[in-house]
């Protein structure tokens, strides 16, 4: 599901909100999650999951064109850990073949 599809689905399920209002709300939520992670924070949505940063250690990679080794710097990457309720619901749906 894309962001546009998510906005469309929410607008359909919440007819009292316009698509523009839903779009603005989704945009604000994503911006706030991004801002919190950018400042080193963690975002937890109970029952859904949590967003945090994980550090990837510096390593030696390879240039795919030449095969030459390339030193890659360490960096922080966003990480999502699903919550228990989300995991259980997904697993139950998959068991039913959805």
Swiss-Prot record:
InterPro entries: Hist_DNA-bd (IPR000119), Histone-like_DNA-bd_CS (IPR020816), IHF-like_DNA-bd_dom_sf (IPR010992), IHF_beta (IPR005685). Keywords: DNA recombination, DNA-binding, Transcription, Transcription regulation, Translation regulation. GO terms for cellular component: chromosome; cytosol. GO terms for molecular function: DNA binding; structural constituent of chromatin. The keyword Cell division does not apply. The keyword Protein biosynthesis does not apply. Signal peptide: none annotated. It holds the Pfam family Bac_DNA_binding. CDD domains: IHF_B. It comes from the Bacteria. SMART domains: BHL (SM00411). Disulfide bonds: none annotated. Residues 56-78 are annotated as: Disordered. GO terms for biological process: DNA recombination; regulation of DNA-templated transcription; regulation of translation. PROSITE patterns: HISTONE_LIKE (PS00045). HAMAP family: IHF_beta. This protein is one of the two subunits of integration host factor, a specific DNA-binding protein that functions in genetic recombination as well as in transcriptional and translational control. Belongs to the bacterial histone-like protein family. Heterodimer of an alpha and a beta chain. This is Integration host factor subunit beta. It comes from Chromohalobacter salexigens (strain ATCC BAA-138 / DSM 3043 / CIP 106854 / NCIMB 13768 / 1H11). The gene is ihfB.
């Amino acid at each position: 599901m894309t962001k546009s599809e998510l906005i469309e689905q929410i607008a359909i399920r919440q007819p009292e909100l316009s698509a523009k209002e839903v779009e603005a709300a989704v945009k604000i939520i994503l911006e706030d999650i991004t801002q919190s992670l950018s400042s080193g924070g963690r975002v937890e949505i109970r029952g859904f999951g949590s967003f945090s940063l994980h550090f990837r250690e510096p390593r030696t990679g390879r240039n795919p064109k030449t095969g030459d080794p390339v030193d890659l710097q360490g960096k922080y990457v966003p990480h999502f850990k699903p919550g228990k309720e989300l995991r259980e619901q997904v697993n139950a749906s998959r068991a039913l073949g959805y």
